[in-house]
Amino acid sequence: MAEDGLPKIYSHPPAESTKTTTEATIFFGADNTIPKSETTITSEGDHVTSVNDYMLENDFSTTTGNKLIPPKERQKSEDDVESHLEKEFATLMDIKNPMANESITENFLPVKTGNISSTDAISLIDFSTDIAKEDILLDTIDPGDKDVSLTSEVSGTPKESTAAIADTPILPNIMGKSDVSNYSSSVKFKVPADGNAHITDSSVPEAEITPTTERNLTTIPDITALTEEKITEIDLILPENDPNVVPKLTDSDEEKFITVFELTTTAERDKDNPEDALLTDEESTDEVSVWMERDMANEEESHSVLLTAVESRYDFVIPASVTMNLTEDLLTEEDLPENNRMESVTKNTDELSGTTPDLDAFSHKEDNFTTETGVFKLLKEEPDEFLI
């Protein structure tokens, strides 16, 4: 290489110009200076030898001279140089910006405030691992009146940039009161010299909680202890000796009674009404339509019987003379034999048939119907008491 930077020109040019190669090598020194690239071509007769396999040794220190080293030693020296450069580069970056590796972490810590179950969120701000000691402020969301200080020692490695702290602060607890909603705490961060991380949690006693009041349980009342309902019994039996006695009700006069007369006996009713009896499986499944027809027929028959009873109730009008004869005959029939008793019955029926009025004459006697001796007089009751 000439002094002016141009390559040297030899009198005999190289025989094989295609084998000529160039290489630019860049070195980074401790002073961050970049040397110039050099291209050297040597010639020994017709054979051209390049300097690509050799390089100048540079150990970033004062050297007495330059030596050519083989490729294996050169690779080893390059590895050493790279590791040395990384250390120096990291040192320079730490000096220029010492807070580059710092990070901010936020942790939400639950806070026990006496007997209140609500929690306060705490944010952890400006947590650094590169500084030996640093005070970290713990702020709560809702500021209050009182402050409580908490000191905890936490140690960690300077290589890691994040850390987590989970400590429960000590809060003053008053029985039945919990008015502390704000507190500030300073955490001292200490890094030991050996670089080992040890986390020490401060022991915090649990806040005492007032016991909850016991629930008042209501006992279920016993069914057998209920008071029995009062049932009023009314005796409506009339004395036989005095026909003028009117029954007196022991209950209030507002209550009304309905007298129901059954025209058929229980045996005939069960025979005429098959729906009262239990049905077999075949009747309930196969003969439903037949049962419905029977039900409709029975309803018509029952209604007809009731209507005839209501219409014919006013036809039984008996004069007073006939009633007196009936009572006398009934008393004498008890002493007569059976033959004479049958004759007296036929005689009484003939007299009744002769004294029974026609339907046309009944309309004229409708007004004085209640005054004559009829069905209601035989029952010793007034008609208004039974009709509603």
Swiss-Prot record:
Asked if the record carries the keyword Cytoplasm, the reply is: yes
> Where does the record place it?
Cytoplasm; Mitochondrion inner membrane; Cell projection, Cilium, Flagellum; Cytoplasmic vesicle, Secretory vesicle, Acrosome
Name positions with the PTM Phosphothreonine: 280
A Gene Ontology annotation in the biological process aspect, one of them, is: flagellated sperm motility
Q: Which InterPro entries match?
A: Ca-bd_spermatid (IPR026118)
Cite the residue spans of the region called Disordered: 1-20
Q: What is its main location?
A: cytoplasm
Q: Which residues carry this modification: Phosphoserine?
A: 312, 344
Tell me which GO cellular component terms the UniProt record holds.
acrosomal vesicle; mitochondrial inner membrane; motile cilium; sperm principal piece
Record's keyword annotation contains Phosphoprotein: yes
Q: Source organism's superkingdom?
A: Eukaryota
- Provide this UniProt record's keywords sorted from A to Z: Calcium, Cell projection, Cilium, Cytoplasm, Cytoplasmic vesicle, Flagellum, Membrane, Mitochondrion, Mitochondrion inner membrane, Phosphoprotein
Citing just one GO molecular function, the answer is: calcium ion binding
Q: What does this protein do?
A: Calcium-binding protein. Essential for maintaining the structural integrity of the sperm flagella.
Q: What is this protein called?
A: Calcium-binding and spermatid-specific protein 1
**Organism from which the protein derives:** Bos taurus (Bovine)
Lineage, highest ranks first: Eukaryota, Metazoa, Chordata, Craniata, Vertebrata
Its gene is: CABS1
